[in-house]
């Protein structure tokens, strides 16, 4: 039990989830303590602003029923730390790191600061090994790399929750002796969504290798800010101390940013773009930059954050700033979803900046880079020809152009589209890629090396497709 070192009965104001404490001395940013109201119930607090004669603290348990008069705040001179253990795998926690599954916490192996320890840039190792998600659009075109941070840009009503559950369930790393774990962080999600994830993880057995940190929309907003940091702290312990390759799936980062805006407004700060605080870029970086690999460490931390773009606007501050920090983005398309295609990836708008270094012989398969480059180039050309066909009619196109239209249909229906419970290996994904590419004439596949085309091209498929 921590011994309080400073105690104040000078709470000036309770403002939303915040306390304003007057005449403070020696209180530090990030310091933890507790506030006790007239009812005698202690609630954990964390300092989020320090001035010469006052401090602002967020109440992690909410301020409902907490008056300013008669409340006492005690500070402990320490930052917020949570107990971590390998036995947390298989457990469900809340945004503060406390059990949500009605079981006691396992004996702690260590206590870790939720703000983490920044990786020295010199100690970082360049990510070059893939994670197999079992989803062709990701594995085949925009491969997720161990130590990468690759977000999904989604929209309201799109199936990003299904994708998050599928990635948690299916993802793995290849290689004997490689330990793999998933940390799932639900940020400000509805009870219905939380029940979906928990039922899915339990039913499929995914929870046996996962830690779930669930922050509900009804939980205090201060806990929403804490939840991703709690999840990442657990992930870092598993990676750096125990050698796990950890995939951190976080949804929905838009809820996190809305919570950040709410706290900023409560502190009376000047708003930035669209009301978000001017330091949102820096704040997001403190989360995203905790991904990576380190020299001399066996494990890695990979981030797969999901955010919903307000009004499908990719220039909105949340996706805009996220794109600056992360190493690519996977964009979901409302048009593809409207055509009944799951997962509804927008292939042209998506990008993985590190994929090129994690694919190929010895990592996935020798033809992987050729397949990815050729599929994207051919699909881009096919989309242009689709627009042309709506103007002049498909019959007025040449036979090669009509082949591209057949290719685009097959690419969407066979390669991109797959079942929610369908898992494809790298080899299966690449084979399907060659199946759809073989609809095109062999001399059109100029983005693939000739020796690769000669080895994998399926001429019988080309001959069987009528145009």
From Swiss-Prot:
Q: Does the keyword Membrane apply?
A: yes
Q: Does the keyword Ion transport apply?
A: yes
Which GO biological-process labels does this protein carry?
proton motive force-driven plasma membrane ATP synthesis
List keywords of the entry alphabetically.
Answer: ATP synthesis, Cell membrane, Hydrogen ion transport, Ion transport, Membrane, Transport
- Cysteine pairings via disulfide bonds: none
Superkingdom of the source species: Archaea
Give any Gene Ontology cellular component. Answer: plasma membrane
Query: Single GO molecular-function term?
Result: proton-transporting ATPase activity, rotational mechanism
Any coiled-coil regions, as ranges: none
Membrane topology type: Peripheral membrane protein
Listed Gene3D superfamilies: 3.40.50.12240
The free-text function statement in the UniProt record for this protein reads: Component of the A-type ATP synthase that produces ATP from ADP in the presence of a proton gradient across the membrane. The B chain is a regulatory subunit.
Protein name (record):
A-type ATP synthase subunit B
Which gene name belongs to this protein? atpB
């Amino acid at each position: 039990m921590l011994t309080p070192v400073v105690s104040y009965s000078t709470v000036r104001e309770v403002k939303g989830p915040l306390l304003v404490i007057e005449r403070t001395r020696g209180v530090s940013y990030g310091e933890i303590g507790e506030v006790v109201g007239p009812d005698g119930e202690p609630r954990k607090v964390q300092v989020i602003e320090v001035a010469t004669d006052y401090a602002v603290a967020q109440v992690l348990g909410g301020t409902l029923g907490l008056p300013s008069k008669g409340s006492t705040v005690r500070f402990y001179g320490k930052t917020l730390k949570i107990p971590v253990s390998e036995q947390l795998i298989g457990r469900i926690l809340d945004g503060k790191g406390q059990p949500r599954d009605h079981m006691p916490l396992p004996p702690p192996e260590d206590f870790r600061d939720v703000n983490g320890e920044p990786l020295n840039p010199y100690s970082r190792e360049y990510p070059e090994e893939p994670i197999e998600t079992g989803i062709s659009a990701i594995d085949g075109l925009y491969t997720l790399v161990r130590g990468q941070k690759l977000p999904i840009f989604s929209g309201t009503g799109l199936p990003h929750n299904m994708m998050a559950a599928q990635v948690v369930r299916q993802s793995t790393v290849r290689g004997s002796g490689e330990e793999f774990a998933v940390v799932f962080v639900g940020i400000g999600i509805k009870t219905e969504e939380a029940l979906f994830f928990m039922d899915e993880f339990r039913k499929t057995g995914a929870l046996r290798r996962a830690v779930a940190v669930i922050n509900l929309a009804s939980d205090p907003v201060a806990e929403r800010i804490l939840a991703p940091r709690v999840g990442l702290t657990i992930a870092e312990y598993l990676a750096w101390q125990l050698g796990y390759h950890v995939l951190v799936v976080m949804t929905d980062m838009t809820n996190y940013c809305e919570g950040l805006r709410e706290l900023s407004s409560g502190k009376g700060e000047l708003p930035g773009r669209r009301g978000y605080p001017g330091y949102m870029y820096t704040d997001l970086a403190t989360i995203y930059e905790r991904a990576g690999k380190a020299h001399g460490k066996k494990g890695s931390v990979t981030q797969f954050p999901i955010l919903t773009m307000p009004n499908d606007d990719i220039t909105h501050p949340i996706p805009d700033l996220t794109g600056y920090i992360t190493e690519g983005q996977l964009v979901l398309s409302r048009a593809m979803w409207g055509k009944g295609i799951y997962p509804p990836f927008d292939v042209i708008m998506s990008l993985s900046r590190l994929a090129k270094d994690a694919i190929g012989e010895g990592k996935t398969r020798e033809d992987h880079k050729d397949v990815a480059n050729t599929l994207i180039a051919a699909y881009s050309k096919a989309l242009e020809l689709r627009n042309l066909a709506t103007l002049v009619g498909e019959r007025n196109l040449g036979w090669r152009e009509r082949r591209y239209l057949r290719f685009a249909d097959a690419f969407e229906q066979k390669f991109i589209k797959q079942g929610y419970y369908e898992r494809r290996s790298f080899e299966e994904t690449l084979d399907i890629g060659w199946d759809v590419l073989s609809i095109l004439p062999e001399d059109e596949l100029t983005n693939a090396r000739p020796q690769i085309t000669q080895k994998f091209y399926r001429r019988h498929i080309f001959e069987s497709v009528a145009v």
